[in-house]
């Protein structure tokens, strides 16, 4: 085989195959048969095998994927991949439009309306036009490197086309990997024939496919991808989102054709109404619609809250309802002892998933709706929302169906169940209940608490079943039981070492994370931060009296009493002693001396909806300015910042004669200079 001929032929084949891939995967307009395409690929493979040094990284043969990945490396996202705030009604969309226009000072604004593909978000990086890295969204700040798996997706170009638009030296684009309904059906038919478990829905199938360790298995999932964002588009001379989508197409990315440029909110609502009726006609699943401010300069001015862009919103379709049968009622014990009833259902497909269980909330809910085993019921589900039984179909009730009564003893440990007067919840009275311990450990390890990576439900249950842990503090002694861990099902040396490293990394977590991780009743993330900031150490919190706790602005008597009760418990003392012995951080960050700034010594209450900040953001700003952000109005309140739809707090401030500032007045007075 002549080398000089191969040097000419390989680039020709790459360009020809790339052209036909684009026509097939992106345009859906193939010009040649599958057999003819396979012949071109086979010729290219043979030439590359004969002359390995001529194989290019953007060769279509590289879509087959590289070697099996032992683990997925972490990839930081810059800027973060934010999630979107949700709208569920016309009123929500009109409110979004109002906030946008107010934030822009009444400027004209147009919106790009797009489909919200129900898949897995990805970020792709190109260097000099060559695809070099792809990552999942992860938590928005950090994702997983799935480059080799993304190479197997035919609609993702390995090299960008610069024919219609110049290709920048460095480019980051974002989009969604998905699976079509037809591919899901075909894969499930093959799985059923082999007697294997079926894939539940296209989204889960796509997510699972993209996280396969072997890229060849990813390729078997026949995934696809739509791209919808150019990061730092303004730096590339792109002025608006609509033009960014066109630029993506020019580079030969696959961009969803179902989009609309609207110049008024009424146009947006018309487009939304149209897709509400047509969404089931699509060959893939969507879980809503996305509305974005078109002008990129306006997007930049509107900015972000701590979680969402202010210039975009996701419209969620109304919850789907289906009829099914209650085959049983089961109970689940939570970390604080609350026992929650659930309806065991005859399987029914709702919102793209098979639903076998729905929450019944509490005893009163069951009694009010008179839900009985054997009843035909209407079950509602929307997106990731937990399914719930909304009503009984009385005319279909079996004649022998009996009213359901709450049991007197805990299903997990047999202890007495009690219901405190004035509360809807029924609780297990046994602090040593294994179900409570299981849930408490899961909460301790969860992302917003200690954030122990790799410690999921199955592993926690296995650790408890094998007697390796009894409580959360025992996690920090698992390094002493490494051999026993390795013997657990699905746990090899690599997995065990990763788990132990993840646990060890949390010893120096901030104090507020540990406080939240303890699972104190009524203490959420905000209250945990208040406690950490006020006391500065776990020891100080333990010694605090009820009056001191109640006096903390924003904490309130209910939380204060719960905190006091928690630290009065001998079992809590035992847990904290074990955590201290394990070297878990019990001290907060040292604060600067007396608060300085324009709000030094002031207590500020925020009420209503603000244009510039979320509630969390303005409370953090108040603290940065030296003040305290409180959750309720009292005579100690210095002033109130009142936004749109301010309620009882505003009324109380007026009754007490406490100054009330608008958002603009607050900015002028405390943020100027």
UniProtKB/Swiss-Prot annotation:
Q: Binding positions for Zn(2+)?
A: 410, 413, 428, 433
Tell me the residue numbers annotated for binding NAD(+): 34-38, 83-84, 114, 137, 176, 292, 316
Instruction: Give the BRCT domain ranges.
Output: 594-673
Q: Which InterPro entries match?
A: BRCT_dom (IPR001357), BRCT_dom_sf (IPR036420), DisA/LigA_HHH (IPR041663), DNA_ligase (IPR001679), DNA_ligase_AS (IPR018239), DNAligase_adenylation (IPR013839), DNAligase_N (IPR013840), Hlx-hairpin-Hlx_DNA-bd_motif (IPR003583)
Which keywords describe this protein according to UniProt?
DNA damage, DNA repair, DNA replication, Ligase, Magnesium, Manganese, Metal-binding, NAD, Zinc
Q: Its Gene Ontology biological processes?
A: DNA repair; DNA replication
Q: Name one GO molecular function term.
A: DNA ligase (NAD+) activity
Query: Which class of enzymes does this protein belong to?
Result: ligase
GO terms under cellular component: cytosol
- Report whether NAD shows up as a keyword of the record: yes
Task: Give the family this protein belongs to, as stated in its UniProt record.
Answer: Belongs to the NAD-dependent DNA ligase family. LigA subfamily.
Q: What does this protein do?
A: DNA ligase that catalyzes the formation of phosphodiester linkages between 5'-phosphoryl and 3'-hydroxyl groups in double-stranded DNA using NAD as a coenzyme and as the energy source for the reaction. It is essential for DNA replication and repair of damaged DNA.
Q: What is this protein called?
A: DNA ligase
Q: Which gene name belongs to this protein?
A: ligA
């Amino acid at each position: 085989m002549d080398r000089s001929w191969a040097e000419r032929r390989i680039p020709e084949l790459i360009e020809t195959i790339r052209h036909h891939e684009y026509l097939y995967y992106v345009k859906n307009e193939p010009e040649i048969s599958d057999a003819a395409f396979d012949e071109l690929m086979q010729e290219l493979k043979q030439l590359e095998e004969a002359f390995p040094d001529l194989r290019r990284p953007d060769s279509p043969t590289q879509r087959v994927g590289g070697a099996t990945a032992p683990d997925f490396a972490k990839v930081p996202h810059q800027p973060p991949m934010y999630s979107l705030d949700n709208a569920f009604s016309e009123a929500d969309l009109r409110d979004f439009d109002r906030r946008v226009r107010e934030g822009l000072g009444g400027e004209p604004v147009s919106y790009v309306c797009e489909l919200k593909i129900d898949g897995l978000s990805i970020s792709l990086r190109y260097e000099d036009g060559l695809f070099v890295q792809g990552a999942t969204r992860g938590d928005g700040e950090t994702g997983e490197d799935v480059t080799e798996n993304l190479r197997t997706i035919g609609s993702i170009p390995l090299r960008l086309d610069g024919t219609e638009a110049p290709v920048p030296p460095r480019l980051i684009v974002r989009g969604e990997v998905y699976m079509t309904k037809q591919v899901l059906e075909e894969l499930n038919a093959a799985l059923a024939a082999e007697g294997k478990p079926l894939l539940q829905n296209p989204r889960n199938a796509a997510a699972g496919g993209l996280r396969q360790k072997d890229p060849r298995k990813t390729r078997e999932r026949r995934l696809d991808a739509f791209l919808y964002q150019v990061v730092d588009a303004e730096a590339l001379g792109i002025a608006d989102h609509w033009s960014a989508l066109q630029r993506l197409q020019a580079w030969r990315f696959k961009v969803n054709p179902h989009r609309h440029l609207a110049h008024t909110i009424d146009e947006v609502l018309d487009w939304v109404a149209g897709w509400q009726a047509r969404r089931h006609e699509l060959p893939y699943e969507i879980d809503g619609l996305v509305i974005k401010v078109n002008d990129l300069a306006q997007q930049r001015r509107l900015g972000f809250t701590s979680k969402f862009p202010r210039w975009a919103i996701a419209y969620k379709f109304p919850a789907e309802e289906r009829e099914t049968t209650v085959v049983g009622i089961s109970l689940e014990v939570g970390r604080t002892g609350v026992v929650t009833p659930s309806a065991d259902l005859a399987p029914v497909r709702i919102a793209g998933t098979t639903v076998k269980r729905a929450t019944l909330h509490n005893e009163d809910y069951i009694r009010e709706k008179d839900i009985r085993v054997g009843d035909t019921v209407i079950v509602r589900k929307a997106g990731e929302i937990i399914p719930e039984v909304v009503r009984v179909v009385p005319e279909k009730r079996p004649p022998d169906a009996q009213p359901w009564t709450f049991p007197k003893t805990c299903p997990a440990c047999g202890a007495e169940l009690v219901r405190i007067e004035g509360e809807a919840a029924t609780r297990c009275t046994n602090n040593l209940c294994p179900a409570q311990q299981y849930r408490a450990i899961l909460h301790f390890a969860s992302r917003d608490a200690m954030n122990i990576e790799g410690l999921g439900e199955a592993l926690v249950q296995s650790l408890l079943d094998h007697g390796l842990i009894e409580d959360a503090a025992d996690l920090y002694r698992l390094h002493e039981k490494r051999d026993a861990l390795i013997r657990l099902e699905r746990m090899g040396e690599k997995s065990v070492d990763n788990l132990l490293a993840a646990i060890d990394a949390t010893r120096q977590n901030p104090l507020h994370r540990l406080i939240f991780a303890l699972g104190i009743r009524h203490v959420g993330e905000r209250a945990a931060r208040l406690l950490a900031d006020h006391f500065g150490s776990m020891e100080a919190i333990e010694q605090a009296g009820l009056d001191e706790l109640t006096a903390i602005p924003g904490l309130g008597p209910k939380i204060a009493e719960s905190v006091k009760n928690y630290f009065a418990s001998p079992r809590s003392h035992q847990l904290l002693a074990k955590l201290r012995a394990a070297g878990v951080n019990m001290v907060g960050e040292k604060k600067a001396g007396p608060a300085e700034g324009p709000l030094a010594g002031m207590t500020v209450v925020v009420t209503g909806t603000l244009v510039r900040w979320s509630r969390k953001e303005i409370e953090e700003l108040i603290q940065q300015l030296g003040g305290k952000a409180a959750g309720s109005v009292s005579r100690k309140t210095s002033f109130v910042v009142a936004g749109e739809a301010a309620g009882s707090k505003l009324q109380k401030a007026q009754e007490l004669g406490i100054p009330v500032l608008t958002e603009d007045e607050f900015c002028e007075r405390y943020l100027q200079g």
